[in-house]
Swiss-Prot record:
Pathway assignment: Nucleotide-sugar biosynthesis; UDP-N-acetyl-alpha-D-glucosamine biosynthesis; N-acetyl-alpha-D-glucosamine 1-phosphate from alpha-D-glucosamine 6-phosphate (route II): step 2/2; Nucleotide-sugar biosynthesis; UDP-N-acetyl-alpha-D-glucosamine biosynthesis; UDP-N-acetyl-alpha-D-glucosamine from N-acetyl-alpha-D-glucosamine 1-phosphate: step 1/1; Bacterial outer membrane biogenesis; LPS lipid A biosynthesis
Cellular localisation: Cytoplasm
Binding site for acetyl-CoA: 377, 383-384, 402, 420, 437
Organism domain of life: Bacteria
Family recorded in the similarity comment: In the N-terminal section; belongs to the N-acetylglucosamine-1-phosphate uridyltransferase family. In the C-terminal section; belongs to the transferase hexapeptide repeat family.
Organism in which the protein naturally occurs: Pseudoalteromonas translucida (strain TAC 125)
Name this protein carries in UniProt: Bifunctional protein GlmU
Pfam families noted in UniProt: Hexapep, Hexapep_2, NTP_transf_3
Length: 452
């Protein structure tokens, strides 16, 4: 028995007021439907079927890296009709998990609980109890057992009082699902083929029906407009903030961070306001992150201080380093232990050695910088000739004077000193002093120009 998922993503989403298909709107930096696809993968689904309609070409472009079966629903005739389009991809002995492309926050643990409750030859429904169930299909029970689902528009006044509602997410045996889908009717207030009708069919055939519930109602909320989308974003970010705090991070304001990927932190981490985490971020112990920083796909060692407005992307920062304010580490930047990068310093594809410092106004690209090197303010590695990139190598304990230009490819030896304002184009040997600038001239009697 294998797991097959069917993800419904055919809706146009007119209330979004957007040319973008609804399921391509993002929560936490990732499209809603990608959240759902990732969940299916994490559950070990052997087949993922994505039922699409509106904006199919754009969907396929943006989700091209996913291994899914693309299933067209040419006419939107209801959820039952949508699932039926995937029948040819469903085996009789499969467990079929039905998910929704605009319901991105369902936790893997919740779906695992639903699957664990699914009878081998039966049906399990994910339900939730709501204080205000308006708009949802109500779960019908007799002596505690599920017997059916009634949609809001078809419900009686008594049934509208029921607080347990259908989330739409269910798991069912493949053979039974295909049988029931073939017998659906559209004789209802909506004139649609309701997937929910299979619950009553199961009951009438004596098939076992079970249910499970999520840990939080927001797990099963969808987004039909941008207000609801913002609500999903805030719920997700609140959960991420709680997880960070439980793992040893102090947040200056839990409502003012954004996690758009995964963050792993050590103990005693301090995170100030408006910090954004993207991709995979790993943070060690005793790290301080100032306000308005962006960390993307990076590793931060223990006892690091990251000052305000610093950007770190695809970079590695070892223990005891200090960055910022207004520093930028671009892809391939590596700071070794106890190195410093200060305000308005940018690094790309550069290794800054242990104990080295670039504290002010520098660009360091395609460089290997040794230990205990001082990079003076305004220093630039001139690594690009308009076509190719070249490398700058600086030995241990070198001193680079302020406002120097190091024209790559160039090698600066250990203990070498570069005079301020120099343009270095040739190798400087170990312990040499290099000065490459115009000779100063002082002119007596010079008169400033005057306005005519």
């Amino acid at each position: 028995m294998s797991l097959t998922t069917v993800i419904l993503a055919a809706g146009k989403g007119t209330r979004m007021r957007s040319a973008l298909p609804k399921v391509l709107h993002k929560v936490a930096g990732k499209t809603m439907v990608q959240h759902v696809i990732d969940n299916a993968k994490a559950l070990g689904a052997t087949t993922t079927n994505l039922v699409y309609g509106h904006g199919g070409e754009l969907l396929q472009q943006q989700l091209a890296n996913n291994n899914v079966n693309w299933v067209l629903q040419a006419e939107q005739l209801g959820t039952g009709h949508a699932v039926a389009q995937a029948n040819s991809h469903v085996n009789d002995d499969d467990t079929v998990l039905i998910l929704y492309g605009d319901v991105p926050l369902t936790k893997q643990s919740t779906l695992e609980r639903l699957l664990a409750a699914t009878p081998k030859h039966g049906l399990a429904v994910l339900t939730v109890n709501l204080a205000n169930p308006n708009g949802y299909g109500r779960m019908l029970r007799v002596d505690g057992k599920l017997v059916g689902i009634v949609e809001q528009k078809d419900a009686s006044p008594e049934q509208l009082l029921i607080s347990e509602v259908n989330t739409g997410i269910m798991a069912v045996n493949g053979r039974l699902l295909k049988s029931w889908l073939g017998n659906l009717s559209n004789n209802n207030a909506q004139g649609e083929y309701y997937l929910t009708d299979i619950v009553a069919m199961a009951h009438s055939e004596g098939v076992e029906i079970t249910s499970a519930q999520p840990d939080h109602p927001m797990e099963v909320e969808g987004a039909n407009n941008r207000i609801q989308l913002a609500g999903l974003e805030r719920a997700y970010q609140a959960w991420q903030a709680q997880e960070l705090m439980l793992n040893g991070a102090t947040l200056a304001d839990p409502a003012r961070i954004d996690v758009r990927g995964t963050v792993t932190t050590g103990e005693d981490v301090l995170i100030d306001i408006n910090v954004i985490f993207e991709g995979k971020v790993t943070i060690g112990h005793n790290v301080e992150i100032g306000p308005n920083c962006v960390l993307k796909n990076c590793s931060i060692g223990d006892n690091v201080i990251i000052k305000a407005n610093t950007l770190i992307e695809d970079a590695t920062v070892a223990a005891k380093c200090t960055l910022g304010p207004y520093a930028r580490l671009r892809p391939g930047a590596i700071m070794e232990e106890d190195s410093h990068v200060g305000n308005f310093v940018e690094m790309k594809k550069t290794r800054l050695g242990k104990g080295s410092k670039a504290n002010h106004l520098s660009y360091l690209g395609d460089a290997e910088i040794g230990e205990k090197v001082n990079i003076g303010a305004g220093t630039i590695t001139c690594n690009y000739d308009g076509v190719n990139k070249a490398k700058t190598i600086i030995g241990n304990n070198a001193f680079i004077g302020s406002n120097s230009s190091l024209v790559a490819p160039v090698n600066i030896g250990a203990m070498a000193t570069i005079g301020a304002g120099s343009v270095i184009t040739n190798t400087v040997a170990d312990e040499q002093l290099a000065i490459a600038r115009g000779k100063q001239r002082n002119l007596d009697g010079w008169k400033r120009p005057v306005k005519k």
